[in-house]
Swiss-Prot record:
Function according to Swiss-Prot or TrEMBL: Catalyzes the attachment of threonine to tRNA(Thr) in a two-step reaction: L-threonine is first activated by ATP to form Thr-AMP and then transferred to the acceptor end of tRNA(Thr). Also edits incorrectly charged L-seryl-tRNA(Thr).
Domain of life: Bacteria
Organism: Nitratidesulfovibrio vulgaris (strain DSM 19637 / Miyazaki F) (Desulfovibrio vulgaris)
Cofactor(s) required for function per UniProt: Zn(2+)
Family (UniProt): Belongs to the class-II aminoacyl-tRNA synthetase family.
Name of this chain's protein: Threonine--tRNA ligase
PANTHER family linked to this entry: THREONINE--TRNA LIGASE, CHLOROPLASTIC_MITOCHONDRIAL 2 (PTHR11451:SF44), THREONINE-TRNA LIGASE (PTHR11451)
BP GO annotations: threonyl-tRNA aminoacylation
Length: 644
């Protein structure tokens, strides 16, 4: 049969393995880097027979994203085998590849600790050196149950029984047997660079009612340099951890015994957040948005109407008032629909752009809560645009322009992913084509590139995801632009067209920064706590050498505050070096030292948080420096900063 491999057509004999088919098509050096393949898009082991209907075979290389994922998944199996050898009686559960590595959950008589990792790694090295092949066996569910019952693996038995299919696949490597869909790398020697990172507790199946397991995290790469770079990134991420910096900078705290997953904003953190919120409101007003706000509690019936009750209620909080059931809002869209519906709209009234810094609550399991990055109460910079179909592309262009300006303001590089129609969806082909083409056209008009994520749109419409890269190369998803065919129909939203008839508007959900809590967490780590001068809670701090300069320092503070700047004066009876060090740890941009010479000259000695000394400056010069520093990032996006 004729099969296309890397753009060339080859005659592949029936019954041959994927390995042999690729070996005949690729150079020796290239073939050695292949870890699996895709036949007509289906991932397969290299030992698998090429299916009879195959027209295309795509090699999966070790250093590709898919190849690295396979290496990590196989490394999880290797780790589980090592743990079983070192700790007799341990029970294995699940061990997937994840974004930056892999993990495996174990049930043992005691929790694993970081002290165990070195021994596990050493045993893994032996297994890697042995080059045990990964072999796949398919069997019935009953056979798999009997297999794992005989091994005493109760967790695997439970998983098998929950699988709806009649047959399952099992992989063997060395002495280890695991239930797995596959595919896997050819043998254990392909895991050339790995490292075990940490241990944690995890409930079986994420349910707090189940047994607590020991989760061991690790990572693996195709080559040692990539692993070294990743480990450096991990160390840098620890230094930038927003939870540590939040405490160091006195921005926020959590009290898990009182309100798990909910933030206590301290004065400086609240000031930073307020500066951000005020900026967002002003920027949206400039761009034609209207400020709105909906209630926190809505009757259950409205959540049933919107579809949230059927599809999202496990993530919602409910209460009863006067015998009526209410849901605490997990999203802002329903209220915005009702605000739109409060008036009969004309085609001349569209588009309507409604913006809300809306507080929402979502029930997240305690095991996934993580500082500001995963919380139960958060604020979204949420907007909903209702427009005519002919206005859709222009509205998306406007949203992309806002994304571009805000990401540029904060110094984030980003990429755009467009997700298209999934198998299960609502709406006509015409609606989907028009919406998808509007997204693609808007991105093209903005002069930006994009990738397509086929079939990953929501059931109610296609979407754009904006993925930003931070200062140490980590990727975060922040912005989402989503076309929705469902809610306007469910809430019977209409406008009167030019023909005098009722028409259904198109709806766009969009959030630019997403959760403000999460964004501030990302921002803290991106800047390692050294926030840009325009948003930092304290822009400058005056430090006195002795009490003799206190009056001058307080007067200077008042003068700078009157100029619209955020300035403190530290007049404590402490050594100057101590006060300077404290200001540097708090990452205050401008440290203004006041001694007798400065008082006599009527100025201050200016030091930057990076240690650079700018010498004696007048207060007017200091104010101008801070103003220019604030304006600089705004100039990049053609925006301006207000000191009011």
């Amino acid at each position: 049969m004729n099969v296309t491999i890397e753009g060339q057509v080859f005659d592949v004999q029936s019954g041959v393995s994927c390995r042999d088919a690729l070996k005949g098509a690729l150079s020796g050096k290239k073939f050695k880097n292949v870890v699996a393949c895709r036949c007509n898009g289906t991932p397969l082991d290299l030992t698998a027979t090429v299916p009879a209907d195959t027209t295309t075979i795509e090699p999966v290389f070790a250093d590709s994203p898919e190849g690295i994922e396979l290496i990590r998944h196989s490394a999880a199996h290797i780790m589980a085998e090592a743990v079983q050898k070192l700790f007799p009686g341990v029970k294995v559960t699940i061990g997937p590849a994840i974004d930056s590595g892999f993990y495996y959950d174990f049930d043992y008589e005691r929790p694993f600790s970081v002290d165990d990792l070195e021994a596990i790694e050493a045993e893994m090295q032996k297994i890697v050196a042995a080059a045990h092949p990964f072999t796949r066996t398919e069997m019935t569910k009953d056979e798999a149950v009997a297999l794992f019952e005989g091994m005493g693996e109760a967790y695997k038995v439970e998983i098998v029984r929950d699988i709806p299919a009649d047959t399952v696949s099992v992989y063997r490597s060395g002495d280890f047997v695991d239930l797995c869909r596959g595919p896997h790398i050819p043998d254990t020697s392909f895991v050339k660079a790995f490292k075990l990172l940490s241990v944690a507790g995890a409930y079986w199946r994420g349910d707090e009612k189940n047994r607590m397991l020991s989760r061991v995290y690790g990572t693996a790469f195709a080559d040692p340099k990539a692993l070294k770079d990743h480990l450096h990134q991990i160390e840098e991420a620890k230094r930038r951890d927003h939870r540590k910096l939040g405490q160091q900078l006195d921005l926020f705290a959590f009290h898990e015994d009182v309100a798990p997953g909910m933030v206590y904003w301290h004065p400086k953190g609240m000031l930073l957040r307020t500066i951000l919120e005020d900026f967002l409101r002003k920027e949206h007003l400039k761009r034609g948005y209207e400020l709105v706000q909906g209630p926190q509690l809505l009757r259950r019936e409205v959540w049933e109407k919107s579809g949230h009750y059927d599809n999202y209620r496990e993530n919602m909080y409910f209460t009863v008032i006067d015998d009526n059931a209410y849901g605490v809002k997990p999203m802002n869209c329903v209220s915005h629909m009702l605000i739109y519906k409060s008036h009969l709209r004309s085609y001349r009234d569209l588009p309507r752009r409604m913006f809300e810094l809306g507080v929402v609550h979502r029930h997240e399991k305690s095991g996934v809560l993580h500082g500001l990055l995963r919380v139960r109460q958060f604020t979204q910079d949420d907007a909903h645009i209702l427009c005519r179909p002919d206005q859709l592309e222009a509205e998306i262009i406007g949203v992309i322009a806002l994304v571009r300006d805000l990401m540029g303001l904060f110094g984030f590089d980003y990429r755009i992913v467009i997700s298209t129609r999934p198998e299960k969806s609502i709406g006509s082909d015409e609606d989907w084509d028009r919406a998808t083409n509007a997204l693609i056209g808007a991105v093209a008009t903005a002069g930006l590139s994009h990738t397509i994520n086929e079939g990953d749109g929501a059931f109610y419409g296609p979407k754009i995801d904006i993925k930003v890269t931070d200062a140490i190369g980590r990727e975060w998803q922040l912005s989402t632009i989503q076309v929705d065919f469902t809610l306007p129909d469910r809430f019977d939203l209409v406008y009167i067209g030019q023909d005098g008839e009722r028409h259904r508007p198109v709806m766009v959900h969009r959030a630019i920064l997403g959760s403000l809590e999460r964004f501030i967490g990302v921002l803290t780590e991106h800047f390692a706590g050294a926030f840009p001068t325009w948003i930092v809670p304290v822009q400058a701090r005056l430090l006195t050498v002795t009490d003799a300069q206190n009056d001058f320092a307080m007067g200077a503070r008042d003068q700078l505050v009157a100029a619209g700047l955020r300035v403190e004066a530290d007049t404590r009876n402490e050594k100057l070096g101590y006060k300077v060090r404290e200001a540097q740890l708090e990452k205050i941009p401008y440290i203004l030292v006041v001694g007798d010479k400065e008082v006599e000259a009527g100025g201050v000695n200016v030091r930057l948080r990076n240690g650079e000394n700018l010498g004696l400056k007048t207060l007017a010069e200091v104010a101008e420096m801070i103003r220019a520093d604030c304006q600089e990032p705004f100039k990049r996006g053609g925006m301006s900063y207000s000191f009011s």
